[in-house]
C-alpha cells in the first residue's frame, strides 16, 4: 500500500496553499487513467477548493452536477482483492487524515441515486502521525493505493476517497474535505458482510475530536489521533 506519509515534514504553522482534487483512478495494472474517466467530476475541478459542510448533500461525492455527472462517468471493472487507487492532481499537501469508503450502487454505479442510504463502509485509512507533540506528514505524495477487500460481494459500487485537511481545523467548519468518487464494477467477489454501515452525509457532525482539532496546540494527555467515522472493514 502507498501511504501519503512517506516523506515527512513537521507542521509548525498553518498552510494556506495546496488545494487539490482526485481526478484519476489507478487501475489494478498500475495504469493511471485520464482525468474524470472513472471518477465523477467534482465541482472544484477548477478551483481545487474543499468541502467544509459535512451536512451538505454535496459532501457525498461533490459532483459537478449530480443528475448528469454520474451518467457521464465510466465504470471501471475490477476484481475483489485487486489493488487500486486514486491520484491527486497535485501533492496531497495539507496535513490530515485520509480514508476510503465504498457503497453498493443501486440501481447502478452511474446512477445519481447510488450511495444515498446507510450503505457506506470504510476499507482503508491513513492516520496522521505525531512526534513530540507535532504532526508529521508527506508533502509530496500524489498517489494512494489500497486493496479492494477479497470477501466483498460482486456488484457495482461507489468508491470514495476523502482527505480531511486539519491545518485550520481548530474551529467548527475549519476542517477541509477533499473528496472523489469512482464508479466500480466488482467481479470475482466473496460472501462477506461489509460494515459498520454509515450514511454520507450523516457520518460526521463536524464536532468529532478528529475533525475539530488544533494540531498546533495538542493537550498534554494527547495519546494519538482519533479517526472519525466507522472502523475499517477487514473483509
From Swiss-Prot:
Keyword Glycoprotein recorded: yes
Binding-site residues for O2, renumbered to this chain: 167, 176
Principal subcellular localisation of the protein: secreted
Protein name per the record: AA9 family lytic polysaccharide monooxygenase D
Assigned EC number: 1.14.99.56
Function: Lytic polysaccharide monooxygenase (LPMO) that depolymerizes crystalline and amorphous polysaccharides via the oxidation of scissile alpha- or beta-(1-4)-glycosidic bonds, yielding only C1 oxidation products. Catalysis by LPMOs requires the reduction of the active-site copper from Cu(II) to Cu(I) by a reducing agent and H(2)O(2) or O(2) as a cosubstrate.
Disulfide bond residue pairs: 61-181
Lineage: Eukaryota, Fungi, Dikarya, Basidiomycota, Agaricomycotina
The family this protein is said to belong to: Belongs to the polysaccharide monooxygenase AA9 family.
MF terms in GO: metal ion binding; monooxygenase activity
Parts forming coiled coils: none
Organism the protein comes from: Phanerodontia chrysosporium
Record note on domains: Has a modular structure: an endo-beta-1,4-glucanase catalytic module at the N-terminus, a linker rich in serines and threonines, and a C-terminal carbohydrate-binding module (CBM). The CBM domain is essential for binding to and subsequent oxidative degradation of polysaccharide substrate.
Biotechnology comment: Lignocellulose is the most abundant polymeric composite on Earth and is a recalcitrant but promising renewable substrate for industrial biotechnology applications. Together with cellobiose dehydrogenases (CDHs) an enzymatic system capable of oxidative cellulose cleavage is formed, which increases the efficiency of cellulases and put LPMOs at focus of biofuel research.
Class in the EC hierarchy, top level: oxidoreductase
Subcellular location: Secreted
Pfam families: AA9
